[in-house]
Amino acid sequence: MVTITNAHTELIHDAVLDYYGKRLATCSSDKTIQIFEVDGDSHKLVDSLHGHEGPVWQVDWAHPKFGVILASCSYDGKVLIWKEENGRWSQIAAYEVHSASVNSVKWAPHEYGPLLLCSSSDGKFSVVEFKENGTTSPIIIDAHAIGVNAACWAPATIEDDGQQSQHLRRIATGGADNLVKIWKYNPEANTYLLEDTLAAHADWVRDVAWSPSVLPRAYLATVSQDRTCIIWTQENNQGPWTKTLLKEDKFPDVLWRASWSLSGNILALSGGDNKVTLWKENLEGKWESAAEIEQ
């Protein structure tokens, strides 16, 4: 385990390893992003990225097929795109379509191309396509009237309607209206249509995380200010969603983040109690605590 201290002067909001686990990006209320090289238990700060004018909430690495590229989002309403070439980092794009804090950024599964999903306190989420000629093509959707706190992609799957096969692009969003919503891309209209609304939380939904597993059953984890985590499941990408409380009693504090392992069978949760807990589904379909890490 790598422990990094004194990386930022204020609260750290996100820390993400790249595809190969060799680079770590962190972001903070100090308005900066730090890039580290990680090798085993050691790490080295290689660059500090400045460009945001407010706290930086989240960062996300693009798939390496697109190059060494990082997206960041901030309270300043901006999404910035950063690229490393020949050991030097530079800002290559600024994306400003939201009128309030941008709370999350997530690159799409690489099969869809360079698409970036952004959620904002202005009540909207957007999906922007970065074209080879340098232009962008955003789709902007009204999602949760009083703010979108988080959004994520479903893993890449193929939909076959009997005539042709095409990628089934789906998105989950979590809002300040306590709701989780599922959206599906409609290629004819070039927009995302509301497919399902999942109502079970009693306070703001803070994060949504779709399991990367490509099993016939979809798993979506949602965490909330109400101190609960819900696992939603759906069979074969259609039909009703089934709700399961991760544990019957509430967590000791608000839950901020949920993250699945690459294989999609272990769920990590972090919250206001400064602990990370790991959870795994047993053979009876019950969720069990697998480990607890004090931060």
From Swiss-Prot:
Report the subcellular localization: Cytoplasmic vesicle, COPII-coated vesicle membrane; Endoplasmic reticulum membrane; Nucleus, Nuclear pore complex
Q: What's a single GO BP term from this record?
A: protein import into nucleus
Entry-linked InterPro entries: Sec13/Seh1_fam, WD40/YVTN_repeat-like_dom_sf, WD40_repeat_dom_sf, WD40_rpt
Which PROSITE patterns does this entry report, sorted A to Z? WD_REPEATS_2 (PS50082), WD_REPEATS_REGION (PS50294)
WD repeat segments: 7-46, 51-92, 97-140, 143-193, 200-242, 250-289
Give a GO cellular-component term. COPII vesicle coat
Keywords on this record? Cytoplasmic vesicle, Endoplasmic reticulum, ER-Golgi transport, Membrane, mRNA transport, Nuclear pore complex, Nucleus, Protein transport, Repeat, Translocation, Transport, WD repeat
From which residue to which does the signal peptide run? none
Q: Name one Pfam family in it.
A: WD40
Membrane topology annotation:
Peripheral membrane protein
**Any one GO MF annotation of this record:** structural molecule activity
Task: Relate the protein's function as given in its record.
Answer: Component of the coat protein complex II (COPII) which promotes the formation of transport vesicles from the endoplasmic reticulum (ER). The coat has two main functions, the physical deformation of the endoplasmic reticulum membrane into vesicles and the selection of cargo molecules. It also functions as a component of the nuclear pore complex (NPC). NPC components, collectively referred to as nucleoporins (NUPs), can play the role of both NPC structural components and of docking or interaction partners for transiently associated nuclear transport factors.
The UniProt entry's sequence similarity note says: Belongs to the WD repeat SEC13 family.
Cite the record's note on assembly. The COPII coat is composed of at least 5 proteins: the SEC23/24 complex, the SEC13/31 complex, and the protein SAR1. Component of the nuclear pore complex (NPC). NPC constitutes the exclusive means of nucleocytoplasmic transport. NPCs allow the passive diffusion of ions and small molecules and the active, nuclear transport receptor-mediated bidirectional transport of macromolecules such as proteins, RNAs, ribonucleoparticles (RNPs), and ribosomal subunits across the nuclear envelope. Due to its 8-fold rotational symmetry, all subunits are present with 8 copies or multiples thereof.
Q: What name does the UniProt record give this protein? A: Protein transport protein SEC13
* Gene name of this polypeptide: SEC13
